[in-house]
UniProtKB/Swiss-Prot annotation:
It catalyses: O-phospho-L-seryl-[protein] + H2O = L-seryl-[protein] + phosphate; O-phospho-L-threonyl-[protein] + H2O = L-threonyl-[protein] + phosphate. This is Probable protein phosphatase 2C 61. Gene3D superfamilies: PPM-type phosphatase domain. Mn(2+) 1 binds at residues 77-78. Belongs to the PP2C family.
Length: 326
């Protein structure tokens, strides 16, 4: 059994299991547990709508994923007319696809194969519904992290980001970035796109942002180089193959944090780490980072509409100690 706590609307029991195609629901931020209650000391998740209308982000923290002490974190930043559809469907289906492949392989040895196979299957599922939901110019980023034993395994598509936060030997806050922001500005990403006849150009109005365009048409102008969906550009170098990595958890590592670019566009890794370490509780850390990013948007870009902001924060060295949800 699982317990699903949708942060936008309160708690509700969920009889489904992740081993099937679990539907986490339609809320933007979901905290899910395979225990009867949600352990409040293990982490938090938050998703705040920006100033562009519908919140197209989705986020998940699944406690007890795969094993009792396991966890899955995911942030999905949708874009385009069907961005919210894509991000929530990936959030709702990819964890069960991934777990199915994890059950059939050695997780630590075959993590790259597991992720690549799972992401390809997920992308095909989105393509299959194109007659109902046209995702030719819509898609989502995905940054996914699985805590498995004393390791954190990460998969990344696009420009959402994962960081590890802890304390150094001299007591200072430390932060390590676990993913690369996969954008057309990365030389190897641009090279792949151009080899497949896609174009990488910036608009005159925003010369600092490189985008991906069709060979002979000035559309769609995608600001990332890897994504689910975005089928207009799949023949021109945009791929749904994740960049993967594995990281050993040490005694100095305290938190794993994932966030959409609505955070990273305005806050540095170090600023985010400081907010987390100063947070009064694990249960509030994600929302405090999201609020800090919102305030930074207002200060730094007062005339620009705030982006959607999603954050997942997991405590790494605490055991499950479930407390009933009131």
């Amino acid at each position: 059994m699982g317990f699903c706590f949708c942060l936008s609307s309160g708690g509700s029991t969920d009889k489904s299991q992740i081993y099937e195609i679990t539907d986490y629901g339609q809320e933007n931020a979901v905290l899910y547990s395979d225990h009867h209650v949600v352990p409040q000391n293990l982490g938090s998740v938050s998703s705040l709508a920006g100033g562009k209308g519908l919140n197209q982000d989705a986020a998940i923290l699944h406690l007890g994923y795969g094993t009792e002490e396991g966890a899955l974190c995911g942030v999905f930043d949708g874009h385009g007319p069907r961005g919210a559809f894509v991000s929530k469907n990936v959030r709702n289906q990819l964890p069960s696809i991934l777990l199915g492949h994890m059950n059939n392989h050695s997780v630590t040895r075959d993590w790259k194969l597991i992720c690549e196979t799972s992401c390809l299957e997920m992308d095909k599922r989105i393509l299959k519904v194109k007659k109902i939901h046209d995702c030719s110019a819509s898609g989502t980023t995905a940054v996914l992290a699985v805590k498995h034993g004393n390791q954190v395994m990460v998969a990344n598509l696009g420009d959402s980001r994962a960081v590890m936060i802890g304390t150094s030997e001299d007591g200072e806050t430390k932060v390590a970035q676990l993913t690369n922001d996969l954008k057309p500005s990365v030389p190897s990403e641009a090279e792949r796109i151009r080899k497949r006849n896609g174009r990488v150009l910036a608009l005159e109005s925003e010369p600092h942002i490189l985008r991906v365009w069709l060979p002979t048409e000035n559309r769609p102008g995608l600001a990332m180089s890897r994504a689910f969906g975005d089928f207009l550009l799949k023949s021109y170098g945009v791929i749904a193959t994740p960049q993967v990595s594995t990281h050993q958890i040490t005694s100095s590592d305290q938190f794993l944090l994932l966030a959409s670019d609505g955070v990273w566009d305005v806050l540095s890794n170090e600023e985010v780490a400081t907010v987390v370490m100063k947070s009064a509780s694990e249960a509030g850390a994600a929302n405090e980072v999201a609020e800090a990013a919102t305030n930074a948007w207002i200060q730094k870009f007062p005339t620009v509409k705030i982006d959607d902001i999603s954050v997942v924060c997991l405590s790494l060295n605490k055991k499950h100690n479930p407390q009933p949800q009131i």
